[in-house]
Amino acid sequence: MISYDDQVLVSYSNQRWEEAEAFSSQFGLRLVALEALPAKSDRAVYLLNFSDTRVELVNWREQAPGPVFVDFVEGALAYRREHGGGRGEMVAKSVGLKGEVKCLNVLDATAGLGRDAYVLAALGCHVVMYERNPLVHALLADGLRRALECADAASVVSRMTLHLGEAFNTFPDGIDVVYLDPMFPERRKSSAVKKEMQAFKDIVGADPDADELLAAALRQEVKRIVVKRPKGAPCLLGREPSFTVTGKSGRFDVYALRKLTGG
């Protein structure tokens, strides 16, 4: 059970009361009808709102940005699916999609909102995702559910499997690559994902066990481990990677352990 001391409330539309009630009961969160919500204030309060169309995380502060939700059907991810850089994407290069390596089994141990997992699945990978925060898991699960209703997106998300919990407690067989994107304290004041980073900072926080995640990954029989890091951030465990794929705002530290193969 999680405890947010009324920092997170669960709200609902009439059509989704049962889902909202089950979630609030499972995780010990207060359930509030939309018409009974408290007045907005400067206090950090979030609603996990089960609306008629989606599950969304709403910042209930005065003058707050819009809601956070997962959308694989429209917007940036749909554009990347149709017009993206293909295997030229940094995440694709980092996991090793090149030449004869066309399909890999990837375990994303820190799924978040599923963006990188979706890019990899769109390129043919099978991605097993683990998310340990139940609020973030609920957002991602709902995004996957809605994507199954769109033929183009469904062909991608059918290669994505989501679990709630710790990836390394029950590590699945047949994984080629472990992908880690631990939360890191956000230093930039202006960002395209500012509202999401603020929400994650408030309800998730940084991952203090990021080093332990890499250590756990290194104990697995996998061929490669990829760690996504901000520019200037130290390497996890102080361990230098085999090589690094670097972009404008971040980098991918790649630990190449065995030769990759994939059909």
UniProtKB/Swiss-Prot annotation:
InterPro entries: 16SrRNA_methylTrfase_J (IPR007536), SAM-dependent_MTases_sf (IPR029063). S-adenosyl-L-methionine binds at residues 115-116, 131-132, 181. It comes from the Bacteria. One of its GO terms (molecular function) is rRNA (guanine-N2-)-methyltransferase activity. Keywords: Cytoplasm, Methyltransferase, rRNA processing, S-adenosyl-L-methionine, Transferase. It holds the Pfam family SAM_MT. Its main location: cytoplasm. Its EC number is 2.1.1.242. One of its GO terms (cellular component) is cytoplasm. It is an enzyme of class 2 (transferase). Specifically methylates the guanosine in position 1516 of 16S rRNA. Belongs to the methyltransferase superfamily. RsmJ family. This is Ribosomal RNA small subunit methyltransferase J. It comes from Hahella chejuensis (strain KCTC 2396). The lineage of its organism: Bacteria, Pseudomonadati, Pseudomonadota, Gammaproteobacteria, Oceanospirillales. The gene is rsmJ.
